[in-house]
Amino acid sequence: MRSDLMKKGVEKAPHRSLFKAMGYTQTELDRPLIGVANSANEIIPGHIHLDKVAEAVKAGIRLAGGTPIEFSTIGVCDGIAMNHAGMRYSLASRELIADSVEIMSMAHPFDGLVAVPNCDKIIPGMLMAMLRLDIPAILISGGPMLAGRAGHKQVDLVSVFEAVGSFKAGTITMEELEQLEDYACPGCGSCAGMFTANSMNCLSEALGLALPGNGTIPAVTGARMRLAKLAGMRIVELIKADIRPRQIATQKAFENAITVDMALGCSTNTVLHVPAIAREAGIDLDLGLFNTLSSRTPHLCSLRPGGPHFLENLDQAGGVQAVMKELLARDLIHRDAMTVTGLTVGKNLESSKNTDPTVIRPISDPYHNEGGIAILYGNLAPEGAVVKQSAVAPEMLQRTCRARVFESETDAAGGILDGKIKPGDVVVIRYEGPKGGPGMQEMLTPTAAIIGMGLGKDVALITDGRFSGGTQGAAIGHVSPEAAVGGPIALIEEGDEILVDILNKRLELMVDDATLKARRDKWKAPAPRMTQGYLARYAHMVTSGSTGAVLRTEQDK
């Protein structure tokens, strides 16, 4: 066993002595030692209950004859970090989470690993670590939050963000806003729509690194705790069979995950995270693959924020497995991909059934013929930009808009809420990319304000930053190259015309080449916003959003 490095032989007597100081018996030490990476904390609603999930995992490990050893890692709540300087740390935390799990699992050579995340950057961070380590591993999440209720209407966190814009526009009262504040988020779990956390939890299941049901079983149910026990039991079997993450997360598995991404209408953040995870397995996923798979994958689910349904509805309809079963009917899924169940995708799907075709549309009757996400290219985004096309109003799929330029997310949010943005405008937020932000902040406050103020059918937003999974509307992010490295977005001036052509996957600055050259000759790189601490190091090392915003090492140069 791998753990023999720290427990076997005469020379390891001091090591065993330290284990015994913590109460481990010799019988426990003789079993497989399994790390349980628990990201529980008291600042994320999706993580507030993870101690209970981890306890269920450990119970499962013991039931199957292993010895669990729990350790912790950090987690940022994107909702609470939103619209202030804290959001710069969210994406950047992904790398620290991956590194911390690597450190703990290499310093203490576990035989296997169970990752217990639930929210936005923690899930990809742990998946990156699993593939980097390539020891037997499984991921079990905490599960989605139930929808809230305000009066007779089901609501969620994004309802509150959008209500701020509605209040500013005078269309709701303070009493109505406070009611939403009190009841939109009823308890523990990842926020209730197909936002980034639930997107990544669903994709971990589609990728094969989590058990069926991981993406959709609600946090508050006994079924979630049973799944956690099963994950604990399953890791012992994965160790015995020596099944490792890179044997599961192959090119075919990533294509399956992206295909499911398109069918579900997942968060645009998946376009950052999936390539970053694949990179740890030595797989290069080009952005063009997202367009290729989107063009052939029907959009089958209309989930919040772009539709009426919540994760609990998707779970009741059969979950991710039922979606994959629909896709399999048209051979859009690789059925021979292996999963942590020890069975192939095809075998897993044999018992799956779509029990509610109003939530999971049959593949013969999709919401849209193309997938939820599109990659746009053009002179404004030579390396690409990302939009959740399934959440864009038809009026904004092809439109020429006037540029209203802001140098930060905070300034843009203020301008929108102060009524300075008019129909036909495109809000440009720049110097918010991975290097420029630094940290590539999410733009949920300005996009929610646009929707809340009734401008969703008339105003677009373009940024080198990124968006919350809760964003809807013509919100185009990850514009690459970013402004801080001299990307074309840095050359936009107030009043410029910009063509947003989602139908043809184009994003064009309608300014002639000579004018752009003159502007470029005058452009100077701004001074770094951060000169000390982690974000200063991050800004120095981070790569483009078009390559997953991963950190560059010396050998990458």
From Swiss-Prot:
Gene3D superfamilies: IlvD/EDD C-terminal domain-like (3.50.30.80). Transmembrane segments: none annotated. The modification N6-carboxylysine is found at K121. The active site is at S468 (proton acceptor). Pfam families: ILV_EDD_C, ILVD_EDD_N. Keywords: 2Fe-2S, Amino-acid biosynthesis, Branched-chain amino acid biosynthesis, Iron, Iron-sulfur, Lyase, Magnesium, Metal-binding. One of its GO terms (cellular component) is cytosol. Its cofactor is [2Fe-2S] cluster; Mg(2+). This is Dihydroxy-acid dehydratase. It comes from Syntrophobacter fumaroxidans (strain DSM 10017 / MPOB).
